[in-house]
């Protein structure tokens, strides 16, 4: 009873704090002058991290195994992973380009985990024999950490694409306006020369220079965090294969979860390969990474929604009242 009450309190505190963090972040986007709000945002995410850590530890002590056996527990761990990713740049004294992604991701996963859809999973249950293994901690924790990092990297790539295409549309629009005005004067050759100089002129402006710097930083951070997530995902898949051999007598069975995990791994392998090719532009690799956002969610939720395959533990069904 005490553990259940403490878990309930920590869940609501963490959700409330991260909601306040989102509100503070929105205020800082509108009012840049309020510097004190930036510190409040970081302290809020630290509070969220410690609350979720306390929640996981409480459930671990109560259940006597790392709480990663169903969708509810893995979502809580995913939210915890987002909070860790948020704090790494802060302690490294880097400019945090991830905070616009990690904080909303934490609140959405936390909100879904505590929603009425997963109420039945809040209660403790005895693990099925296949899950009573030390590989549970290794395999599932690495997979969820990999999902969190890859999701953040994919969202950064999506942001890069949005900013890049907005820049191209803006330049194209200005170019067309200039061409129309120049054609009315009949200066065709002059238009061609000015048209070639237009991108350079736009680049030299302070606004476009800042945008260029932002694109470069988004590209760098997406590459870093996707590389980290790919390592976690690889370790998770390999440890899962060893566990599968112990539990089912085969390293790989091509059930839905394993198939989509392989698709996810292959997609991000392609992304990392494109990064080694200097002829490949950052936009092209960002397109590959952004595709991974959808693939990860299919891999993560697909089996739980369908409730099929060898990995259907902790699946849930949507029921109407």
Swiss-Prot record:
Biological process annotations from GO: cytochrome complex assembly
Source organism, top-level taxon: Eukaryota
InterPro entries, A to Z: Cyt_c_assembly (IPR002541), Cyt_c_biogenesis_CcsA (IPR017562), Cyt_c_biogenesis_CcsA/CcmC (IPR045062)
Cellular localization per UniProt: Plastid, Chloroplast thylakoid membrane
Alphabetically ordered keywords of this record: Chloroplast, Cytochrome c-type biogenesis, Membrane, Plastid, Thylakoid, Transmembrane, Transmembrane helix
Membrane topology: Multi-pass membrane protein
Cystine residue pairs: none
Family matches, as HAMAP family: CytC_CcsA
Subunit structure and binding partners: May interact with Ccs1.
Task performed by this protein: Required during biogenesis of c-type cytochromes (cytochrome c6 and cytochrome f) at the step of heme attachment.
Name by which UniProt lists this protein: Cytochrome c biogenesis protein CcsA
Organism expressing this protein natively: Morus indica
Source species taxonomy: Eukaryota, Viridiplantae, Streptophyta, Embryophyta, Tracheophyta
Gene: ccsA
